[in-house]
Amino acid sequence: MPQLRQDLITGRWVAVATERARRPDSFTQAAKESIAARDVCPFCPGHESMTPPEVLAYRPPGTMPNSEGWWIRVVPNLYAAFRLEPDGQEQRAGRFWQRDAIGACEVLISSPDHRAPTPLLPGRQVEEMVQSYVDRYRQHARNPTLEHVLILYNHGRPAGASLEHPHSQLYAIGLLPPTYLEELEGARRFFEQEGECVFCRTIADERRAGVRVVFENESFTVFAPYAARAPFETWIAPRRHVASFGDLDTGREKSALAEALQVTLRAFYDGLNDPPFNYYIHSALLKGNVADAWISDAYHWHLEIVPKLSIAAGFELGTGIWINVVKPEDSAAFLRERIAEGAGPPADASGARGVAPREPRFSAMRAIETSGGPGERLRRSP
């Protein structure tokens, strides 16, 4: 019998169509063609003039901005949907409201290597990528005109990636998006009724049950949500209660997040043959005012990964109710098995692999592999 499951945080309903269910391994992807050649890629070293001037770069001391030598580079998006220019005043357009699209759009280039998606990056490089997320998040959080910062990663053409070179995107905008408001309202309601954070409760319940847990380390729990909207939807959440991603501890927590993200994405890579996916970070942008007090208590930042293995069709668009043809318990078990196998990704042309093989214990904390990562002191350009 198909099930309807309700999301504890938002109240949304999801249909888990068990009679239409497919085996998790039936989602393995076919081989893909390259999206863009390296000789025309604006994100490759040597092509720095093809992008706007960098706003942040991790590079060896003594190297010039907007030149080769970097291992992380952040630039404004050339085709920005939001801009930090007008004042954003609302105006009438007949019976409708309109306003200038105030905000900033940035591209965070994860690696100089054109063909190194996040699952194959050395562990130290993923840490540096996470550090760039934190640096840019904190920078935009200081702007009083901005209300929300979203960091996202699109992998593969079906997920919206127009360039193959690994890169994330940042949107800092002057309004609160509906998805965040929906989560915030659910968190407020639960906090008022139960006196605790709904995300903390969810994490504790998932760890206790265990059937939807994919991976754990000392700081983060990776799990398939009970009311997952799509096959293999997976969340990464800090066990420490913290509302804003900007408050991530850039020591142990940064390393633990990098590990959790890389291990999970590599399980997708190994088990589903590098599927297209999106991930994004939901976070409260705290301004230090009175309203932030309850948000700090009730909300909890987290990262959501949604592989593009099914299509939202007329029913989903018409009702807002998603149909998931894989039980979250089954997808979590499948990913756990891939992690336990510890199979490494294919070697690149040089024979190097992205990360060292892991011990077959999905819940054990392991040190981030550091060989092959940037070894020199960081230089952050303004």
Description of each model-found segment:
Residues 1-382:
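HIT superfamily nucleotide-processing domains
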